[in-house]
């Protein structure tokens, strides 16, 4: 499958040949056959090509050229000036990069401002749940996604995981920000920069022997399937868990929250034919692309330890066992084992019993419950975590890499 790109596939095999090639590749990589229909997408139609073999034909050649020309340091310096959606691009950018960025910053025609506003308000209103699930649910689940763990670990960002996690948190904050897609917001900027980072990693990581030896046969990282795996570990997982916890979510708020993530996927370069149009479609796609691929890797376990170490800095490690137990409760014991979360049987049983009561109280469904004091300690620790990583004042520079992780 060397050099297997969407363009080459369509040129050399035709539809029937492509299906055969994709089926063989799926078996080799132990991936389920791609059967999700584009009729369930925001586009409503599509050619149905497996996103495993679709990358970013707009961004990838441009960023490869920028890297090969040695322009990354100068470009990063210029891009530090670009922080708001309504800002003009900085002067001095290479022409091909400027052209790409001007195109990439355009919102999709189907974006609904009212839905985006409502979705952002929902994220703010449910901030304690959304923030905790992003960080201690989705963030830790990402370490059980082998490709994501290895792409992070062996890329330049893997050398400074605290900075890498902060940048990931920045994306989560910007998506949920009340001003995310407004002129004075910054989500368009964050999305375009992240899309360029992904393109740079696709160019660089295949040059890493360490990544190539552990990639499971993948020749180019961060396919559109990989992006949607991450998307589901965030959007679909968070909505599913909130409903399981008994958080009150009405239909309009759920649809608005989904719309925020639909627009964000588009802005990150995902083809509209892979973006679910409804939560039912999202759950169906998640069961196909996310659930079967969760697994243990040494890289993922190492990243879990780094993340929990950062959380421990909040209070010198006093609540680390509690946070670990909450994460196991949130992710489930199977995923907890995959990523090396220590078992905390007593705390896990306590949280499983009392956390739903605490949620019901916060949602105004029951009076103040009689829960162990440790649960209030947990809630306070979660609030500190959310404030630390989703703080508006935390300005993070998203830089394009020009090297892999140093060996």
From Swiss-Prot:
GO terms for molecular function: heme binding; metal ion binding; oxidoreductase activity, acting on single donors with incorporation of molecular oxygen. Induction: Weakly transcribed during growth on glucose. Strongly induced by poly(cis-1,4-isoprene). Pathway: Biopolymer metabolism. Changing residue 232 to A: No effect on catalytic activity and on heme binding. Changing residue 6 to A: Impairs clear zone and aldehyde formation. Heme binds at residue 198. Its EC number is 1.13.-.-. This is Rubber oxygenase. The lineage of its organism: Bacteria, Bacillati, Actinomycetota, Actinomycetes, Kitasatosporales.
């Amino acid at each position: 499958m060397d050099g297997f790109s969407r363009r080459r596939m369509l040129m050399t095999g035709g539809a029937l040949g492509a299906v055969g090639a994709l089926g063989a590749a799926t078996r080799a990589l132990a991936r389920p056959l791609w059967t999700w229909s584009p009729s369930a997408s925001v586009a409503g139609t599509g050619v149905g090509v497996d996103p495993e073999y679709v990358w970013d034909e707009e961004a990838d050649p441009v960023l490869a050229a920028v890297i090969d020309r040695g322009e990354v340091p100068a470009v990063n310096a210029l891009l530090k000036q670009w922080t708001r959606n309504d800002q003009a691009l900085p002067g001095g950018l290479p022409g091909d990069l400027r052209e790409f960025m001007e195109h990439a910053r355009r919102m999709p025609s189907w974006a609904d401002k009212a839905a985006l506003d409502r979705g952002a308000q929902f994220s703010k209103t449910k901030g304690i749940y959304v923030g905790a699930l992003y960080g201690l649910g989705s963030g830790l689940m990402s370490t059980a996604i082998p490709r994501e763990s290895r792409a992070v670990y062996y890329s330049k960002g893997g050398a400074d995981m605290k900075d890498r996690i902060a940048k990931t948190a920045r994306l989560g904050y910007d998506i949920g920000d009340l001003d995310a897609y407004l002129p004075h917001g910054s989500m368009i900027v964050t999305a375009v920069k992240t899309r360029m980072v992904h393109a740079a990693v696709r160019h660089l990581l295949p040059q890493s022997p360490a990544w190539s030896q552990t990639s499971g046969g993948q020749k180019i990282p961060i396919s559109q399937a990989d992006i949607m795996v991450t998307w589901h570990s965030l959007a679909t997982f968070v909505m599913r868990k909130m409903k399981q916890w008994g958080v009150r979510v009405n239909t309009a708020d759920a649809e608005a929250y989904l719309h925020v993530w639909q627009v964000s996927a588009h802005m990150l370069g995902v083809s509209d034919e892979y973006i679910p149009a409804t939560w039912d479609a999202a759950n169906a796609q998640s069961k196909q692309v996310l659930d079967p691929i969760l697994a243990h890797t040494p890289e993922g376990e190492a990243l879990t330890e780094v993340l929990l170490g950062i959380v421990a800095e909040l209070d010198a490690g006093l609540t680390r066992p509690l946070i670990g137990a909450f994460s196991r409760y949130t992710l489930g014991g199977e995923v907890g084992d995959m990523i090396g979360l220590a078992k905390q049987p007593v705390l896990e049983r306590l949280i499983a019993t009392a956390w739903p009561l605490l949620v019901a109280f916060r949602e105004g469904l029951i009076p103040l419950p009689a829960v162990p004091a440790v649960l209030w300690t947990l809630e306070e620790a979660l609030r500190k975590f959310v404030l630390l990583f989703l703080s508006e004042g935390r300005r993070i520079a998203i830089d394009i890499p020009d090297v892999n992780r140093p060996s």
